[in-house]
């Protein structure tokens, strides 16, 4: 198991408080959202994987925001399509 130095990750995010928020958000995505890790797992927990992703510059708060917006738009489009299909079926 590789050691993660938090200082490297803090430098990527800006401060340790935002680092905690971004790492927790990303770890939660992997744990409950079914998102795949962007770095090799190496038998690490999701929090460690999230910190390694941040350390390598693969994840930032802005990246997470953009991805969530894209997913939300895709889901809304799918819901609209389903509603349209139902409405057309009733005509």
Curated annotation (Swiss-Prot):
GO cellular component terms given for this protein: DNA-directed RNA polymerase complex
GO biological process, one term: DNA-templated transcription
Disulfide-linked positions: none
Gene3D superfamilies: 3.90.940.10
Enzyme class: transferase
Keyword S-adenosyl-L-methionine appears in the UniProt entry: no
Gene Ontology MF terms: DNA binding; DNA-directed RNA polymerase activity
Pfam family, one: RNA_pol_Rpb6
InterPro entries: DNA-dir_RNA_pol_omega, Pol_omega/Rpo6/RPB6, RPB6/omega-like_sf
Keyword terms: DNA-directed RNA polymerase, Nucleotidyltransferase, Transcription, Transferase
Reaction catalysis annotation: RNA(n) + a ribonucleoside 5'-triphosphate = RNA(n+1) + diphosphate
UniProt-listed Enzyme Commission number(s): 2.7.7.6
Homology family: Belongs to the RNA polymerase subunit omega family.
Function: Promotes RNA polymerase assembly. Latches the N- and C-terminal regions of the beta' subunit thereby facilitating its interaction with the beta and alpha subunits.
Subunit structure: The RNAP catalytic core consists of 2 alpha, 1 beta, 1 beta' and 1 omega subunit. When a sigma factor is associated with the core the holoenzyme is formed, which can initiate transcription.
Name used for this protein in its record: DNA-directed RNA polymerase subunit omega
Organism expressing this protein natively: Enterobacter sp. (strain 638)
Classification of source organism: Bacteria, Pseudomonadati, Pseudomonadota, Gammaproteobacteria, Enterobacterales
């Amino acid at each position: 198991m590789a050691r993660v130095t938090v200082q490297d990750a803090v430098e990527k995010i800006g401060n340790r408080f935002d680092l905690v928020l971004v790492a927790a958000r990303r770890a939660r995505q992997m744990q409950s959202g079914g998102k795949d890790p962007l770095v090799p797992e190496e038998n690490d927990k999701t929090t460690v994987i999230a910190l390694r992703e941040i350390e390598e510059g693969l994840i930032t708060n802005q990246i997470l925001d953009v991805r969530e917006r894209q997913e939300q738009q895709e889901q809304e489009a799918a819901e609209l399509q389903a509603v349209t299909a139902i409405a057309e079926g009733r005509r």
